[in-house]
Swiss-Prot record:
This is 26S proteasome non-ATPase regulatory subunit 11. The lineage of its organism: Eukaryota, Metazoa, Ecdysozoa, Arthropoda, Hexapoda. Disruption phenotype: Embryos develop and hatch normally but fail to outlive early larval stages. During the first and second instar larval stages larvae become immobile and sluggish and die without any observable defects. Lethality is probably the result of additive defects in overall cell proliferation rather than of distinct developmental disorders. The keyword Ion transport does not apply. Component of the lid subcomplex of the 26S proteasome, a multiprotein complex involved in the ATP-dependent degradation of ubiquitinated proteins. In the complex, RPN6 is required for proteasome assembly. May act as linker between 19S regulatory subunit and the 20S proteasome core. The gene is Rpn6. Component of the lid subcomplex of the 19S proteasome regulatory particle complex (also named PA700 complex). The 26S proteasome consists of a 20S proteasome core and two 19S regulatory subunits. Interacts with alien/CSN2. Interacts with Prosalpha2 and Rpt6. Pfam families: PCI, RPN6_C_helix, RPN6_N.
Amino acid sequence: MAGATLFERAQALSSVNREEQDSSLLNKLVRDQEGAENDEERIRIKEQGILQQGELYKQEGKAKELADLIKVTRPFLSSISKAKAAKLVRSLVDMFLDMDAGTGIEVQLCKDCIEWAKQEKRTFLRQSLEARLIALYFDTALYTEALALGAQLLRELKKLDDKNLLVEVQLLESKTYHALSNLPKARAALTSARTTANAIYCPPKVQGALDLQSGILHAADERDFKTAFSYFYEAFEGFDSVDSVKALTSLKYMLLCKIMLGQSDDVNQLVSGKLAITYSGRDIDAMKSVAEASHKRSLADFQAALKEYKKELAEDVIVQAHLGTLYDTMLEQNLCRIIEPYSRVQVAHVAESIQLPMPQVEKKLSQMILDKKFSGILDQGEGVLIVFEETPVDKTYERVLETIQSMGKVVDTLYQKAKKLS
């Protein structure tokens, strides 16, 4: 069969000197009209050939060629059912977006596909592509565009009752609001997504994404790392069951929760489990280094870990936010430990002891005094920190007030009883 021969040729393409072969094969795959147009077997083989060609381009990192393939297949898509065409387009677009090639044409390609779907009056395909465009806007930090398109799409989906896509868009909306630090709206969007998800079957990947976002919001908003850990664990198990790369992210955030809870000793125990052994690598090594520095309360080790694992720590927005809090806590603990024996100490000595620039130490000490972490003043003229002794609070006045209030209640009660007798 001619279609089968084309499919075999697509599979057998070599990785060098084949641009002309690619072009010739594509033309035959999408324009060859031999045989009946309603031949299901022939259509199936063409679909497989197109997907195989797309997979080859993805593996070889040929983003431009894959984008051209998506456009070239449109005449063929018009001759098959809407459901098959939608599945084929979504698969090719997903391949292109999964490449992370950074060509700069991702947004425009999605828009072109959406425009084509509008012209062909393929509503469900358009909505599915718009959901992918929202995800692309989120990944490229175009949050305003993501929210605008999301609001429009949500109105349509609620009318059509497409719950699977509705969950996806509501989850993206929650992520976008979180990125904008609008935590109340992020929580509201996530609650809507969970409510919708409860009414349908959610694949492990979608359920894992919901659990992951729940953990992130609990950690960010309420600093409830214990509950966040539970959600991250559920997400990890869900992603692990489908071999998703997000499982590593979930495990990383689980370790972060343990560190923030002051349970750094549990980190090694977690990463030695059967499930976690599969995910060993730089991300896990980075969290182990931070856990060790936290356990030792060593700022030097902490900064060394941040420097060595910059990509894994500083470039992860979620981890960076919480490690900033952890660094501040460790810095305060170290400063309190250094100044504790003194009533008057040179700021230069404190800076030297903690191995940080003097202006940074002065700023932090001033902040700690204002936050009432200790009593004292900074004499910048002399360059010294004067620490006051903690004077015990005299509670005599408080106790007198409590006694007077109690006596007042007794007198009021006696008055009410006397009033009844009279």
